[in-house]
């Protein structure tokens, strides 16, 4: 009987003990292994995830989508590097971009008139925000996730499906499609909505409250499509 018990113990996984449940660490590890395996078999392009941790910003490349605001899982299976807020620059993302945030100032610092087509914004907290607009360039699809009490915690919006050709790869100044995002939508008081205005040629004069166009003037010899998301 003793040899039988010894053999049984030798073949028992270290994540388990007799008559007990698996530890939380083992569950997290098994979940991560499953996600990595899924990403391997689907051969999906890595997604970019940006979130704040303390006074730094974490920029991560992930094999698959990570559950909203699961920082432990993101650090476990994604390849991440820390960036100081002062080092953030205007940039472009050619794939999916997900941002987890807890305050609007950080979100504004990360976006900073970013050039991105497919964006997901997840509010990892219960803060409420006043009306304030952030500018995004080239946005085609927006997804949001909040922890609000409103039933519409997760919403999606298709802004447009028109392509800008090669302009996406020439820098944010060449952007033809500009979206203004009202951060009050994260309060979850209503469903996600938008409206667009075509053929706008003078952004600085038509939208004087946005400093983006004063510090970095947009070319005036072309027509823009402006979308307001609220």
Swiss-Prot record:
Q: Where is the signal peptide?
A: 1-44
Query: What are the record keywords, sorted?
Result: Glycoprotein, Secreted, Signal
Q: Which GO terms describe its biological process?
A: mitocytosis
Secreted listed as a keyword: yes
Is the Ligase keyword given for this protein?
no
Q: Where is it mostly found?
A: other
Tell me a Gene Ontology molecular-function term this record carries. identical protein binding
Tell me where on the tree of life, at the top rank, the source sits.
Eukaryota
Tissue localization of expression: Low expression in liver, three times higher in kidney and abundant in testis.
Maturation and modification: N-glycosylated.
Stretches of the chain forming a coiled coil according to its record: none
Q: Where in the cell is it found?
A: Vesicle; Secreted, Extracellular exosome
Q: What is one GO cellular-component annotation here?
A: migrasome
The role this protein plays is: Likely to be involved with PKD1 in the detection, sequestration and exocytosis of senescent mitochondria.
Q: How does it assemble?
A: Homooligomer. Interacts with PKD1 (via the PKD repeats in the N-terminal extracellular region); the interaction is not dependent on N-glycosylation of either protein.
Q: What is this protein called?
A: Exosomal polycystin-1-interacting protein
Q: Which organism is it from?
A: Mus musculus
């Amino acid at each position: 009987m003793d040899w039988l018990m010894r053999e049984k113990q030798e073949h028992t996984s270290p994540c388990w003990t007799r008559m007990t449940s698996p530890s939380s660490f083992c569950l997290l590890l098994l979940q991560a292994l499953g996600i990595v395996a899924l990403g391997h078999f689907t051969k999906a392009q890595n997604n970019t995830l940006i979130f704040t941790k303390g006074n730094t910003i974490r920029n991560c490349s992930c094999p698959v989508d990570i559950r909203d605001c699961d920082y432990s899982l993101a650090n476990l299976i994604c390849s991440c590097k820390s960036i100081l807020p002062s080092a953030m620059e205007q940039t472009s993302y050619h794939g999916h971009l997900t941002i987890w945030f807890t305050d609007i100032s950080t979100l504004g610092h990360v976006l900073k008139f970013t050039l991105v087509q497919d964006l997901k914004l997840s509010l990892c907290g219960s803060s409420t925000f006043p009306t304030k607009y952030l500018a995004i360039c080239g946005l085609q699809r927006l997804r949001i996730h909040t922890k609000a009490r409103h039933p519409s915690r997760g919403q999606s919006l298709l802004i447009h499906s028109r392509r800008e050709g090669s302009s996406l790869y020439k820098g944010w100044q060449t952007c033809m499609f500009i979206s203004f995002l009202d951060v009050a939508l994260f309060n979850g008081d209503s469903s996600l909505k938008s409206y667009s205005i075509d053929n706008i040629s003078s952004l600085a004069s038509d939208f004087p409250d946005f400093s983006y166009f004063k510090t970095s003037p947009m070319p005036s010899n072309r027509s823009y499509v402006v979308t307001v998301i609220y």
